Amino acid sequence: MSSTKLEDSLPRRNWSSASELNETQEPFLNPTDYDDEEFLRYLWREYLHPKEYEWVLIAGYIIVFVVALIGNVLVCVAVWKNHHMRTVTNYFIVNLSLADVLVTITCLPATLVVDITETWFFGQSLCKVIPYLQTVSVSVSVLTLSCIALDRWYAICHPLMFKSTAKRARNSIVVIWIVSCIIMIPQAIVMERSSMLPGLANKTTLFTVCDERWGGEVYPKMYHICFFLVTYMAPLCLMVLAYLQIFRKLWCRQIPGTSSVVQRKWKQPQPVSQPRGSGQQSKARISAVAAEIKQIRARRKTARMLMVVLLVFAICYLPISILNVLKRVFGMFTHTEDRETVYAWFTFSHWLVYANSAANPIIYNFLSGKFREEFKAAFSCCLGVHRRQGDRLARGRTSTESRKSLTTQISNFDNVSKLSEHVALTSISTLPAANGAGPLQNWYLQQGVPSSLLSTWLEV
C-alpha cells in the first residue's frame, strides 16, 4: 500500500529541507563557503554514516531478507512438487508468497539504503518502477488474503452456494494481478526524483529523494485516503467479519452440509439377534464418524493458521498506514522538533512491512504439518543429508499404521450393531469432554473401545 512506499520520504533526522540544512547554526553546512569535496565528506561523516542503532536495523533487514526469500521460495516449491498440496487455499498461499518474494527482492534493498543514507541512488527510471512494484505487491497481498477469507467463508458457512475449484482459484489469481497492476498506475506517474541540495546536484547524488509530485494539495490527500481505505481498512474489516463467522461455525455450531456424527441417540444393548449385515452397516457408520471428525479438525487447523496470518498482516501494516495518513493527509512531521524519534518510527515501520513477508512461512511451519514436513525435507536435502529412503520408509510405516488403526477401530466395534439406527446430528461443541463421564463415552467403554482410541476420536 502507499504507506509502505520508498517515496514516503522520511522526516530528515536533523532537517526537512535544503533550506533548513543551510540555515543550521553549523557554518560548515553552507556549501558555497567551503570546498565541495570537504563539504561532502562532512555530510557523510555527520549525516550519512550509519548510527549505532542503524547497524541493528541493517542486521534486522538482512535477517528478514534471508528468511523471507528462502521461506517463500520453499512454500512455492512445496506446493509445486506435491500434487496433494495443490488445494484452493494453497494456490492462494503460493500467490501470497510470490508477492512477498517480489517485494523482498525489488524493494527491500532499496528501502534499506534510503532509510540509512536518506538518498535515492537508483535514478529516475527506478524511482518510478520500484515504488510501483512495491504497491502492486502489497495490493496483491491484500486481495489474496481477501480471496482466502472469502473462499473459506463460502466453504464453511455456505457450502451449497458456491463451489470453489482449483481452476477458479487460478483465474482469481490472474485477476488479482491484473487489477493490482492497473490501480497502481497513478503511483508510477507521480513519482519524481529531485535533489535537496540543488547547488550540488551536478556533482553528487547525495540527498537525492524520490517522492510524489502532485499538481495540487487536494489530490494527494484524496489519493492516500482512498488508498488507506481500499488497501487496508475495508479489506481488513471484511476479513475480520468473515473469520468471525467461520469461528462460530467451526467452534460453536454444526457445519452446514456435513454429516458429522458427534452424538447419537442410543439404547442399551439387547440380547437379541441382529439382522445379517447390520454389523457391517455399523462399521461403515463408525468409519464415517472418524472421517467427519478428522475433516472438522483439519478445517479448524487451517482456519487457525489463516487467522494468524491475517492478524500478523494487520499488525505489521498498521504503524506505517497510520504514519502515512498522518504525514500525507494531515501534514504532520514536517516541522516537528524531535526528528530523530519520527525518523526511528518510520524506519521501524518500514522494517515491519518486510518482516510480514518473513513471518508467513514461519507461521506455515508451526501451524501446518504438511508445510512443516516439506520444509524439513528441503532443508535436509540442502544440508546434504540423504534421507529420501528414510522418508519413504517413514511414509510407508505411517500408511501401514493408518491402515492398521482403521482395522483396529472397526474390529473394536463388532457389537456396535446394537446401536440405534436413529442418528442425531448435532454440533461438535455439544460433545462431552473426552475425560468426562457422559453416557455416550460410558457405553462405548462398555463395548470394549479402548480409552486411548476414544480420546483420539473425541479430541477437538
Swiss-Prot record:
PROSITE patterns found in the cross-reference section: G_PROTEIN_RECEP_F1_1, G_PROTEIN_RECEP_F1_2
Covalent S-S links between cysteines: 127-210
Residues carrying the site annotation Important for responses to orexin: 44
Keywords in alphabetical order: Cell membrane, Disulfide bond, G-protein coupled receptor, Glycoprotein, Membrane, Receptor, Transducer, Transmembrane, Transmembrane helix
Protein's cellular compartments: Cell membrane
Transmembrane segments: 55-75, 89-110, 128-150, 171-191, 223-243, 305-326, 343-366
Keyword check for RNA-binding: no
Ranges in the topological domain labelled Extracellular: 1-54, 111-127, 192-222, 327-342
SUPFAM superfamilies: Family A G protein-coupled receptor-like
Region feature (Required for response to orexin-A): 33-49
Cytoplasmic side: 76-88, 151-170, 244-304, 367-460
Annotated GO biological process: cellular response to hormone stimulus; circadian sleep/wake cycle process; feeding behavior; G protein-coupled receptor signaling pathway; locomotion; neuropeptide signaling pathway; phospholipase C-activating G protein-coupled receptor signaling pathway; regulation of circadian sleep/wake cycle, wakefulness
Keyword Nucleus applies: no
Membrane-topology descriptor: Multi-pass membrane protein
InterPro entries: GPCR_Rhodpsn, GPCR_Rhodpsn_7TM, Orexin_rcpt, Orexin_rcpt_2
Record Pfam families: 7tm_1, Orexin_rec2
GO molecular function: G protein-coupled receptor activity; orexin receptor activity; peptide hormone binding
Tissue specificity statement from the Swiss-Prot or TrEMBL entry: Expressed in the brain in the cerebral cortex, septal nuclei, hippocampus, medial thalamic groups, dorsal and median raphe nuclei, and many hypothalamic nuclei including the tuberomammillary nucleus, dorsomedial hypothalamus, paraventricular hypothalamic nucleus, and ventral premammillary nucleus. Not detected in the spleen, lung, liver, skeletal muscle, kidney and testis. Orexin receptor mRNA expression has also been reported in the adrenal gland, enteric nervous system, and pancreas.
Comment, domains: The N-terminal region is required for orexin signaling.
Role played: Nonselective, high-affinity receptor for both orexin-A and orexin-B neuropeptides. Triggers an increase in cytoplasmic Ca(2+) levels in response to orexin-A binding.
Similarity section: Belongs to the G-protein coupled receptor 1 family.
Stated name of the protein: Orexin receptor type 2
